[in-house]
């Protein structure tokens, strides 16, 4: 899980979702997991 100021899709399988007011990126590749913080 990377915590970043700006979250972006890294590959085609990445999805940007809003969960409880937090922007997250979920992907099949665990290295691509990100959270805005």
UniProtKB/Swiss-Prot annotation:
GO terms for molecular function: structural constituent of ribosome. PROSITE patterns: RIBOSOMAL_L36. Keywords: Ribonucleoprotein, Ribosomal protein. GO terms for biological process: translation. InterPro entries: Ribosomal_bL36, Ribosomal_bL36_sp. GO terms for cellular component: cytoplasm; ribonucleoprotein complex; ribosome. HAMAP family: Ribosomal_bL36. Belongs to the bacterial ribosomal protein bL36 family. This is Large ribosomal subunit protein bL36. It comes from Solibacter usitatus (strain Ellin6076). The gene is rpmJ.
């Amino acid at each position: 899980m990377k915590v970043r100021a700006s979250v972006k899709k890294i590959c085609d399988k990445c999805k940007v979702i809003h969960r409880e007011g937090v922007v997250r990126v979920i992907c099949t590749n665990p290295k691509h997991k990100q959270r805005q913080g």
